[in-house]
Amino acid sequence: MRTTVILALALLVGLASANLLVNGDFEQTIDVGWDTVAVNFAGGDTFTWSDTLGQPSPGYAVAVRKYLADYASMSQTVGIPNVNLTLTLDGRLEIGGGSSTCWPVAAFVVRYLDSSGVSLGNTKLYLHDQYCDWAVSDTQSLIDVTTPGVWTQFSLDIADELAKSLPGVAAANVKKLTVDLYAYDNGT
């Protein structure tokens, strides 16, 4: 199985449109501002930084790939002034293969954290196969990506998402966000 997350992104604040992410445009190598981790029970992983990934806008993008179990992740945690933020990104998510014992997921995850860094909940924009058993809850929102392999512009209004989709997450307690490019496969 192969899972790929390819993204160019920005986390914007109000009218000023200031990017809160360090190297959010990926104009520098991915070791600037981003943490990468891979857990390999089987298969391998790759993290790619390039200006030739087919992205619709000029500049650089990154690809996170995971082959078989378990996951590869590229993330960044930032303090936020409030939840009146809009996350925008150009993304292309792809998965390959899949079965009831080995199902892949490609996701862009936003984790909502308190001031101590404790997770309060998350939103996942994700591409998955029919065996994926992730479920919506009062602290987890799942947004299906319906354009596999196609560059798509996504936008997530953080305040609106918390109010409408995450009743178990108090917006006033959200002091940090983690953005995570997440490639996952549950089996071998």
Feature map (PLM): residue ranges:
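Extra-cytoplasmic beta-strand recognition segments
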Residues: 26, 72-118, 154-160, 179
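Sec-dependent signal peptide recognition
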Residues: 2-8
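Surface-exposed coil/turn segments at beta-strand junctions on protein surfaces, enriched
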Residues: 67-69, 80-82, 101-103, 146-151, ...
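N-terminal signal peptide c-region/cleavage motif recognized by signal peptidases
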Residues: 13-15
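Extracellular glycan-recognition surfaces and repeat-rich motifs
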Residues: 19-65
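Extracellular carbohydrate recognition and processing domains
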Residues: 120-170
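Extracellular carbohydrate recognition
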Residues: 148, 168-173, 182-188
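Secreted extracellular polysaccharide-interacting domains
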Residues: 61-81, 134-137
